[in-house]
Swiss-Prot record:
Catalytic activity: L-seryl-[protein] + ATP = O-phospho-L-seryl-[protein] + ADP + H(+); L-threonyl-[protein] + ATP = O-phospho-L-threonyl-[protein] + ADP + H(+)
Modified residues (Phosphoserine): 278
InterPro entries, A to Z: Kinase-like_dom_sf (IPR011009), PDC10_dimerisation_sf (IPR046409), PDCD10_N (IPR048288), Prot_kinase_dom (IPR000719), Protein_kinase_ATP_BS (IPR017441), STE20/SPS1-PAK (IPR050629), STK_STK25 (IPR035060)
Protein name (Swiss-Prot/TrEMBL): Serine/threonine-protein kinase 25
Family recorded in the similarity comment: Belongs to the protein kinase superfamily. STE Ser/Thr protein kinase family. STE20 subfamily.
Location in the cell: Cytoplasm; Golgi apparatus
Enzyme class: transferase
Any single Gene Ontology cellular-component annotation: extracellular exosome
Organism ancestry: Eukaryota, Metazoa, Chordata, Craniata, Vertebrata
Result when mutating residue 49 to R: Loss of kinase activity and autophosphorylation
GO biological process: axonogenesis; cellular response to oxidative stress; establishment of Golgi localization; establishment or maintenance of cell polarity; Golgi localization; Golgi reassembly; intracellular signal transduction; intrinsic apoptotic signaling pathway in response to hydrogen peroxide
Residue numbers carrying Phosphothreonine: 174
Gene field: STK25
E.C. code: 2.7.11.1
Tissue/organ expression: Ubiquitously expressed. Highest levels are found in testis, large intestine, brain and stomach followed by heart and lung.
Taxonomic source organism: Homo sapiens
Length: 426
């Protein structure tokens, strides 16, 4: 219950039901449920995310991180955060209501013209330019995390895995994001910076053009092995040369040669093909017509545990919470949930520590094996995949590698004992 005490100290204890009227449910995911609501004082429409902290212990740090980042942001290109309220074990997070749905929703009725794509990408770039100027990395850019207002305004959302760079920490090395959109340097857990978001933007550009990211037909774990090894994806098909060049610029495997968000705003695909954001209302209307015709009912929650239907049948936006790899509790991510920067962070939830054998045994052994293979002219690809498998397993289940090593040692000891016993009886 320590995490509840921490939240109670940092969030208003005013009964949120006195301040807000909860209306239709417009989304459901691993972080809880999202409702359309009304601010009783201003009569403004808001989004209310309600999380049961007792049921979401594994997500406490992500919730803290999202609130921390959102409370520090002040940009028309970032979803606005209005405050948090704790009622019993339920945390109410009040945010800007964006009734146009996500960019992923807008893809469902069919392909987008390049003018729409360029306009959406321009607004994402403005959001990234702001975040990066604030020394923040989003780390999970994709169509599902781009929301639109009913007027066509485009805003970045879902900051549960966003990272903060300090003056003394120029690059990060935590393994987070969604596999298909993840930059090679993030997968390899090399030091990385804002340029990781630019790679994800390039994948998102392909997603907007094709309806899905590259390698979407493969298992996500397989994709994590392929992205660092393979050549960067390219935009194939009947698309303009400037669009293909934009994608190519984003998807340079060497992050040093990827342009910044500010530089990409000057790219000819952005400067020549974009229109005002009000132009995007055509896509929002298209999606609403498509939904009203009964499409998407069967597959609306196919990729995540979403329920996007309003209870009264109203066509509300689907607030998506797709599967994302989250940072381990021992990453150097600056955490802490606060309404004001002077407040202390909530007590972190204790979790299983990462395996010690990774640094003392696994990595040294793989390093020696790879060196021997290189000297003999052999390929180290299979060894790198196996080494990466340990890291991936550790992210989802900290401590699993140590358990594996204990079992292996016990098995070897039993085998050696049995063998010695047989030898001594002969």
């Amino acid at each position: 219950m320590a995490h509840l005490r921490g939240f109670a100290n940092q969030h208003s204890r005013v009964d949120p039901e006195e301040l807000f009227t909860k209306l239709d449910r417009i989304g459901k995911g691993s972080f809880g449920e999202v409702y359309k609501g009304i601010d009783n004082h201003t009569k403004e429409v808001v989004a209310i995310k309600i999380i049961d902290l007792e049921e979401a212990e594994d997500e406490i740090e992500d919730i803290q991180q999202e609130i921390t980042v959102l409370s520090q942001c002040d940009s028309p290109y970032i979803t606005r955060y209005f405050g948090s309220y704790l009622k019993s074990t339920k945390l109410w997070i009040i945010m800007e209501y964006l009734g146009g749905g996500s960019a992923l929703d807008l893809l469902k009725p069919g392909p987008l013209e390049e003018t729409y794509i360029a306009t959406i990408l321009r607004e994402i770039l403005k959001g990234l330019d702001y975040l990066h100027s604030e020394r923040k990395i989003h780390r999970d850019i994709k169509a599902a995390n781009v929301l639109l207002s009913e007027q066509g305004d485009v805003k970045l959302a879902d900051f549960g895995v966003a990272g903060q760079l300090t003056d003394t920490q120029i690059k990060r090395n935590t393994f987070v994001g969604t596999p298909f959109w993840m930059a090679p340097e993030v997968i390899k857990q090399s030091a990385y910076d804002f340029k990781a978001d630019i790679w994800s933007l390039g994948i998102t550009a392909i997603e907007l053009a094709k309806g899905e990211p590259p390698n979407s037909d493969l298992h996500p774990m397989r994709v994590l092995f392929l992205i660092p090894k393979n050549s960067p994806p390219t935009l194939e098909g009947q698309h303009s040369k400037p669009f293909k060049e934009f994608v190519e610029a984003c998807l340079n495997k060497d992050p040093r040669f990827r342009p910044t968000a500010k530089e990409l705003l000057k790219h000819k695909f952005i400067t020549r093909y974009t229109k005002k954001t009000s132009f995007l209302t055509e896509l929002i209307d298209r999606y609403k017509r498509w939904k009203s015709e009964g499409h998407g009912e069967e597959s609306s929650s196919e990729d995540s545990d979403i329920d996007g239907e309003a209870e009264d049948g109203e066509q509300g936006p689907i607030w998506t919470f797709p599967p994302t790899i989250r940072p381990s509790p021992h990453s150097k991510l600056h955490k802490g949930t606060a309404l004001h920067s002077s407040q202390k962070p909530a007590e972190p939830v204790k979790r299983q520590p990462r395996s010690q054998c990774l640094s003392t045994l696994v990595r040294p052994v793989f390093g020696e094996l790879k060196e021997k293979h290189k000297q003999s002219g052999g390929s180290v690809g299979a060894l790198e995949e196996l080494e990466n498998a340990f890291s991936l397993a550790e992210e989802s289940c900290p401590g699993i590698s140590d358990k594996l090593m204990v079992h292996l040692v016990e098995r070897v000891q039993r085998f050696s004992h049995n063998r010695n016993h047989l030898t001594s009886t002969r």
